[in-house]
A protein has these predicted regions:
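Charged helix-capping and loop-helix junction motifs
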Residues: 95-103
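Conserved, mostly hydrophobic/aromatic
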Residues: 36, 82, 197
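Glycine-rich tight-turn/loop motif centered on a GG-T
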Residues: 5-12, 43-58, 92-93, 151-163, ...
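Acidic (Asp/Glu)-rich catalytic clusters
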Residues: 22-34, 73-76, 107
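Glycine/small-residue-rich loop that forms an oxyanion/phosphate-binding "nest" at active or ligand-binding sites
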Residues: 42-84, 91
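Catalytic beta/alpha-barrel core
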Residues: 7-12, 91-92, 110-121
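C-terminal domain-boundary segment and adjacent tail
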Residues: 113, 206-236
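Active-site rim beta-loop-alpha module in soluble metabolic enzymes
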Residues: 121-182
Length: 236
């Protein structure tokens, strides 16, 4: 039910054996693999903010994505994209200096750089900088999280998992109108090229199946994204 997987690279979760096993599984099922670098915080699952300099963000991103890239190369696969995790995502959204350091590392690792970030991507410092550096920025939509009135993600998930009936309605609305409803029932316009769901959700498999069925019913074909070349922040 998925085309692409974000893989933790050892800092907030994961380890060498898990990375190798997961890459093999992804290859077996034809799933593209992207790096999911985070902060060096296993106990906090990378969700606690840390004070890092731009050079530390650059080095940490290079280290994690480089490790996964090597595992992929050993299995005749390529790194598909990079997507920051947890508190690192929030830090890059707020800081242009950290965002530039992250983007610089991505360019040096990826032959055709793509970063995945929550829509609307113009809300984030790192995505604005990355686009200007020629990185393909992929806006993502979420159905296991809620949105505020300006399209920001509310980073809290229901313990019981996503409401599947509500997911069907939200997906249908987005496909028809290009809008999602905020927690206050305000319509928010969105542009997205990918739909993200969290694999640790209690009903993640059912959620993936629900989304896939909805997309298939609307005649969408699911496949890993192909990078869109950019020049000075614009599609080539």
């Amino acid at each position: 039910h998925i085309t692409t997987a974000n893989m933790a690279c050892g800092f907030h979760a994961g380890d060498p054996m898990t990375m190798v096993k997961t890459v093999r599984l992804a290859k077996q099922h034809g799933v593209a693999v992207g790096a999911h670098p985070g902060l060096a915080d296993l106990l906090g699952f990378g969700r606690r903010t840390m004070a890092l300099s731009p050079e530390e963000v650059y080095a940490d991103t290079l280290y994690q994505t480089g490790a996964l890239s090597a595992v992929l190369k050993a299995h005749d696969m390529e790194l598909h994209h990079v997507k920051p995790h947890g508190a690192l995502y929030s830090m890059l959204s707020a800081s242009e200096a950290l965002g530039e350091a992250f983007a610089r590392a991505v360019i040096e690792i990826c032959p055709e750089p793509m970063i995945y970030y929550p829509a609307p991507v113009e809300n984030h410092a790192v995505t604005r900088i990355a686009a200007d550096m020629g990185i393909d920025v992929v806006p993502e939509l979420y159905f296991d999280l809620s949105y505020d009135d300006v399209g920001g993600l509310i980073l809290k998930r229901a313990n019981e998992g996503a409401d599947l009936a509500d997911t069907k309605l939200r997906l249908a609305r987005f496909l028809e109108s290009g809008e999602v409803l905020s927690v206050n029932d305000k319509p928010v316009a969105m542009t997205a090229r990918s739909i993200c769901l969290h694999g640790d959700g209690p009903n993640a498999v059912d959620l993936a199946r629900t989304i896939c069925d909805g997309l298939a019913a609307a005649d969408y074909t699911l496949a890993p994204l192909v990078p869109t070349p950019t020049i000075a922040g614009k599609a080539a």
